């Protein structure tokens, strides 16, 4: 998937070597990928069927920002928990899975095929590809899609969404949540206000002060959002 941005979506370049792209707890070696990736239009047909079990392969906070209508939330905090969640389904069921860009689903797809599941479908290119190719009128998507860069969330046509990120807990924030009395820019939000220590709040407040000072002197601060 390719998408354009008017600003630098990442603060800096990082290259890491990891054993797994998305840790799931099982090895994939010399395996032929199942040919069951559906394009957005094919996907719409499959998920509208009553016997299709639609599963969101992402984390709960991503699900809360937006998801497909009638999709199931596995309520996982990391991808290693996903196999255990999948084991509850019957091998004869029609399983349709999706994630942000398709990577997580590729691994889950292989996992289910190895377990003997016959009817498994994944969204080719993930949610990003879907939002880029399906207009809102024909869409089965509800809400926005969380992305792991400075855009925070995107809408149909890959337009930037309305969410921002809390500097205290790094969780996405809606416009409504930012109106809460527990929200303080750069420090905390309703999701972390009651969980942060006084020391953490003090450190975050100092960081926010530095960002404001940098802005006044027209200097770029590494933590300053550019959207």
Predicted segments with their positions:
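Rhodanese-like catalytic fold shared by cysteine-dependent sulfurtransferases
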Residues: 1-36, 52, 59-95, 103-227
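A conserved helix-loop-strand patch within extracytoplasmic ligand-binding domains
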Residues: 35-39, 47
């Amino acid at each position: 998937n390719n998408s354009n941005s008017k600003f630098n979506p990442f603060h800096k370049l990082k290259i890491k070597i990891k054993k797994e792209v998305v840790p799931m707890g099982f090895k994939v070696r010399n395996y032929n990928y199942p040919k069951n990736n559906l394009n957005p239009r094919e996907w719409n047909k499959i998920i509208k069927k009553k016997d299709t079990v639609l599963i969101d392969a992402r984390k709960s906070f991503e699900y809360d920002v937006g998801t497909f209508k009638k999709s199931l939330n596995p309520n996982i905090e990391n991808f290693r928990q996903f196999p255990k969640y999948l084991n509850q389904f019957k091998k004869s069921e029609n399983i349709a899975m999706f994630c942000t860009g398709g990577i997580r689903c590729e691994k889950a797809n292989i996992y289910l095929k190895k377990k003997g599941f016959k009817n498994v479908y994944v969204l080719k290119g993930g949610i990003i590809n879907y939002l880029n190719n399906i207009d809102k009128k024909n869409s089965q998507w509800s809400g926005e899609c969380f992305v792991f860069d400075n855009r925070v969330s995107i809408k149909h046509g890959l337009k930037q969404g309305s969410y921002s990120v809390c500097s205290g807990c790094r969780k996405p924030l809606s416009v409504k949540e930012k109106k809460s009395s527990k929200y303080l820019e750069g420090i905390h939000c309703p999701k972390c206000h009651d969980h942060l220590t006084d020391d953490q709040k003090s450190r975050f407040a100092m960081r926010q002060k530095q960002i404001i000072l940098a802005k006044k002197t027209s200097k770029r601060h590494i933590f300053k959002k550019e959207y």
